[in-house]
């Protein structure tokens, strides 16, 4: 797992949604969403479960304060990932509520989860191509430290950020 921890990745799902993740340590991630249903959302210090399934294959899973469940299988050597996201009904119907720096709005996420319907879940199972991969070390607070903006992933891939 030591080669996986510290990984900073940008990946694009087959449906076109572009995400960025930093495996901060063995139990925490930071991420930004650059396109898709909740583009503009970003989160730091999300508690996760990380396991090595077999050589070169890692699973990262978590439940968010929104009630969204996520399970991602990374195959960095293959530049592939398979993810499945279980969005609660309310997130699918009101995604704009979640498009923020979640850490500053945890109470709003919990209130919305209680206020709106959560079922049926909107399930998104997709493969993705990893388009950027760099090990940034453990607990690097600079990797994901600002809101996503138009062209950010191009800046990261070009080394400008």
UniProtKB/Swiss-Prot annotation:
CDD domains: PAD (cd14241). Substrate binds at residues 11, 13, 41. It comes from Bacillus subtilis (strain 168). Homodimer. GO terms for biological process: catabolic process; response to toxic substance. Changing residue 19 to A: 4% decarboxylation of ferulic acid. Keywords: Aromatic hydrocarbons catabolism, Decarboxylase, Detoxification, Lyase. This is Phenolic acid decarboxylase PadC. The active site is at 19 (proton donor), 64 (proton acceptor). Induction: By ferulic, p-coumaric and caffeic acids (at protein level). Cells extracts from caffeic acid-induced cells exhibited lower activity on the three acids, which indicates that caffeic acid could be a less efficient inducer. Up-regulated by salicylate. The keyword Lyase applies. Disruption phenotype: No longer metabolizes ferulic acid. Optimum pH is 5.0. Involved in the decarboxylation and detoxification of phenolic derivatives. It is able to catalyze the decarboxylation of ferulic, p-coumaric and caffeic acids. It catalyses: (E)-4-coumarate + H(+) = 4-vinylphenol + CO2; (E)-cinnamate + H(+) = styrene + CO2; (E)-ferulate + H(+) = 2-methoxy-4-vinylphenol + CO2.
